[in-house]
A protein has these predicted regions:
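C-terminal helix-rich "cap/oligomerization" subdomain common to oxidoreductases
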Residues: 17-24, 34-57, 391-394, 532-607
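Rossmann-like NAD(P)H-binding beta-loop-alpha module
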Residues: 221-281
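NAD(P)-dependent dehydrogenases' Rossmann-like dinucleotide-binding region
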Residues: 67, 234-252, 376-387, 443-448
Length: 607
C-alpha cells in the first residue's frame, strides 16, 4: 500500500503516528499509556483488555473449534487459556487435525501464526492434549456429535463459507454461543436468520446468546488508535479512502488452489501429486540431515504425511459435489480443498478479502457518527472477472469497486482545516449527506491476483492529514500530503492539528513503548472479549462485531458481487444499496436469497 514511500518517509510516518497517539492519550486519557508501560501490559500480555475495556474471567469458557484448516488454526493460536478452554476440535481432514495440535511447520512464520494446541495450552505432547481435547470427525459423528457434546458451551466456526450459517444455526438451536469466521454467511438471508436466532436465543444458563463474527480489525489496537485520531480531528473532513488487497498469485502459483491429496490428472494423462513429491523430497533430505535440521524435517514429514492422508477422505460423504462448468469437469475433491474458488462453497474475492477492508472503512466513517450506528454505503460500481487464471474456478481473480458513502455531519466546533472568507464557508458546522447530498466519501477498492505491488491496506484522506494503515501492522500519519515532515500535535482554536513546530525532539513516544512486541492483528482480543461477554452477561456487554455489524459487512460485500454480476451480464456494474437490506428484521435482500428457504436449509443436520 505504501511501496512508493522511502524508508525515511515510512519512519517519519510511524513516528508522527506514535507522537499523535501519545498526545491523544495525554489529553483524553491521561496516564493510560504510561500505565500500560508501567504494568507491563503490552503486546499479548493484556494490551487488548486495557484498550477494549474487558477484564479477566474466573472460569474459562469451554469451547469447540469446528474447522481447523488454515484460518481455524490461526484462531486456535488466538485462544488464550485464561479465557477459553478448547475441549474439542472437529474436522474431517487428518491434515487439519494434525496442525490443530502441532501447528503449521511449513515455515517459521506459519508456525508463529498457527502454533497449535500443544504450544497454546502448554501440553507436553499430543497424547496429553488428546486426554483433554476430544477430536470429532466422520468416525464418531462429526459436527452433530460435537454440537451435542454436553461439555461444550460455545463454538468457534472456521469452516468453508457455505457451512457457516447451518452450523451456527444448529449451535444456537442447542443454546451454544458462536464466534464464526467472516464472512458471516454465504448469503444475506442466512445472515438475517442467524441474527434473529441470536436475538431470540438463550444459553444453557438462560443468559443472552452471543453471536460474534471474526472481522478482527474491530480488535486491532492500531485501528482503534486510528479511529481515535480521526475523531480527534487530526485528519479534518474525510472525503476519500483508498483500499486494496493485491496478491502475486499466478497460474501454477496460487495460494487458493491448494494441491489435491492423491494427485490430479494432467493433460498428458499422467498424475501429478505435489504432496507426495514434497514428502519424498523431505524424506530424502532427512537421511543426510544433522543437528537441528533433523527435528525440523521430522516435524515437516509428520505434517506432510497427515496432508497425504487426506486422500482417504471422500468429500461426497460430506456435502461436496462433482460438477461441470461448460466442458470443464470439477471433482468434489477440488471443491473441498479449493472451496474459495467456487461460488457454491465460497463467495469470491469480496467475501474473503474485500469484506475485511470495507469493514475497516465502515469503522472509520462510523466513528464520526454521533448515534453510534454503522455507516452504510449508498452505491457501488464494480467491474472485474477471471482475467489471468485458467478455467479452474468460477470465482474471479480481479475486482475493482467504487463505493459512495454518506459524508458525516461535523460538529460546529470540529476543525476541518479550511475557511473561505469570500464564500463565508463553512458558516458553522460542515453539513453531512443528509443536509447536503453532495457531501459524500468515495471509497475505491481493488483486489487482484497476478501482482502483489502495494500489498494490502487502507489510505484515509482528509482535509488536514493522511493516515495509512499498512498490512494491519504499521500506521503512518502525515500532515496533508507531506511525507517528509516530522509533526506533533498542537492545540488550536476549534481543536487539534498536526504541526511541524510541535514535533519536539522526536524521541520515542510512550505510544511506541506501549506497542512493543509482536503486533496483534486482533484474533486473540476478539476471542477474549467474546468469552468475557459470555461470562459477564450484562446487557451492555456484547462483542464489537455483533450480528447487525457483521451483517452490514456481508451486505456490502455480497452487494458488490451483485454489481459485478450486473457488469458481466450487460446491465452495467452498478448497485444502489437499500436500507432495508441492512435491517435484520426486514426480509429484503440484495442477492435474491430467501428467508424461509434458508431457515429450512440451515436447520438440517450437516456432515
Amino acid at each position: 500500500m505504501v511501496d512508493k514511500l522511502s524508508n525515511d518517509e515510512r519512519e517519519v510516518g510511524k513516528q508522527n503516528y506514535y507522537n499523535a497517539v501519545t498526545s491523544y492519550y495525554d489529553v483524553n486519557r491521561r496516564d493510560f499509556l504510561r500505565g500500560i508501560v508501567a504494568t507491563g501490559a503490552v503486546s499479548g500480555a493484556g494490551l487488548g483488555a486495557a484498550y477494549f475495556g474487558y477484564g479477566q474471567v474466573k472460569d474459562p469458557v469451554r469451547i469447540a473449534v469446528i474447522g481447523t484448516g488454515d484460518e481455524g488454526n490461526v484462531l486456535i493460536g488466538g485462544c488464550n487459556p485464561n479465557y477459553v478452554d478448547v475441549k474439542a476440535i472437529c474436522d474431517i481432514r487428518p491434515f487439519s487435525q494434525h496442525r490443530a495440535f502441532h501447528g503449521d511447520c511449513s515455515s517459521p512464520s506459519a508456525l508463529i501464526r498457527r502454533p497449535g494446541l500443544i504450544s497454546v495450552a502448554g501440553y507436553s505432547n499430543e497424547a496429553e492434549a488428546r486426554k483433554n481435547v476430544k477430536v470429532y470427525d466422520s468416525s464418531n459423528g462429526g459436527i452433530m456429535a460435537c454440537l451435542d457434546d454436553p461439555d461444550i458451551e460455545a463454538v468457534i466456526i472456521a469452516l468453508p463459507l457455505w457451512l457457516h450459517a447451518p452450523v451456527a444455526a444448529l449451535a444456537m438451536e442447542r443454546n451454544l454461543h458462536v464466534l464464526t469466521e467472516k464472512l458471516m454467511a454465504h448469503n444475506v438471508a442466512q445472515c438475517k436468520v442467524m441474527g434473529r436466532m441470536a436475538a431470540a436465543g438463550q444459553d444453557k444458563n438462560g443468559n443472552p446468546l452471543h453471536l460474534a463474527t471474526g472481522h478482527q480489525r474491530h480488535y486491532n489496537v492500531k485501528y482503534e488508535n486510528a479511529v481515535n485520531l480521526i475523531r480527534w480531528g487530526l485528519l479534518g473532513q474525510l472525503h476519500h479512502i483508498r483500499a486494496q488487497w493485491h496478491r502475486g498469485n499466478l497460474p501454477g502459483r496460487d495460494s487458493w488452489s491448494m494441491p489435491i491429496p492423491g494427485g490430479e490428472k494432467m493433460p498428458n494423462g499422467k498424475t501429478f501429486d505435489r504432496i507426495a513429491k514434497d514428502l519424498a523430497h523431505r524424506r530424502a533430505k532427512l537421511k543426510t540431515a544433522t543437528g537441528a535440521d533433523v527435528k525440523r524435517l521430522q516435524a515437516e514429514i509428520a505434517q506432510w504425511e497427515a496432508w497425504d492422508a487426506d486422500k482417504t477422505i471422500d468429500p461426497r460423504e460430506h456435502g461436496y459435489e462433482d460438477f461441470a462448468r461448460g466442458d470443464q469437469m470439477f471433482t468434489a475433491e477440488e471443491e473441498l480443498h479449493r472451496w474459495r474458488l467456487f461460488q457454491r462453497t465460497g463467495a469470491g474475492l469480496m467475501a474473503e478479502l474485500g469484506s475485511h477492508q470495507l469493514d475497516a472503512v465502515s469503522i472509520f466513517l462510523s466513528s464520526l457518527r454521533s448515534d453510534g450506528k454503522k455507516v452504510h454505503p449508498l452505491s457501488v460500481h464494480a467491474v472485474g472477472g477471471r482475467h489471468i487464471m485458467p478455467l479452474d474456478r468460477d470465482a474471479g481473480d480481479h475486482i475493482y469497486c467504487t463505493f459512495e458513502f454518506p459524508g458525516p455531519e461535523y460538529a460546529e466546533t470540529f476543525d476541518v482545516g479550511y475557511y473561505d472568507p469570500v464564500e463565508n464557508y463553512p458558516n458553522g458546522a460542515v453539513p453531512g449527506y443528509e443536509q447536503d447530498p453532495n457531501k459524500k466519501v468515495v471509497v475505491t477498492y481493488s483486489t487482484i491476483n497476478g501482482n502483489g505491488f502495494g500489498g494490502w491496506g487502507e489510505v484515509v484522506m482528509g482535509t488536514k492529514g493522511t493516515l495509512v494503515l499498512d498490512k494491519e501492522t504499521d500506521v503512518l500519519l502525515y500532515r496533508n500530503s507531506d511525507t517528509s515532515s516530522k509533526v506533533g500535535v498542537k492545540k488550536e482554536e476549534g481543536g487539534y492539528a498536526l504541526d511541524t513546530s510541535a514535533s519536539g525532539d522526536f524521541a520515542a513516544p510512550v505510544a511506541q513503548t506501549a506497542a512493543t512486541g509482536p503486533v496483534s492483528r486482533g484474533y486473540r482480543e476478539e476471542i477474549e472479549h467474546w468469552a468475557y461477554c459470555i461470562r459477564n452477561p450484562d446487557k451492555e456487554n456484547k462483542p464489537r462485531c455483533y450480528p447487525e455489524v457483521a451483517m452490514g459487512d456481508a451486505v456490502i460485500a455480497l452487494g458488490a458481487n451483485v454489481a459485478l454480476k450486473n457488469s458481466q451480464t450487460g446491465k452495467g456494474g452498478y448497485l444502489q444499496y437499500k436500507e432495508e437490506w441492512f435491517d435484520i428484521d426486514n426480509d429484503a435482500t440484495p442477492d435474491g436469497s430467501d428467508i424461509k428457504r434458508e431457515q429450512e436449509y440451515m436447520l438440517k443436520d450437516v456432515t
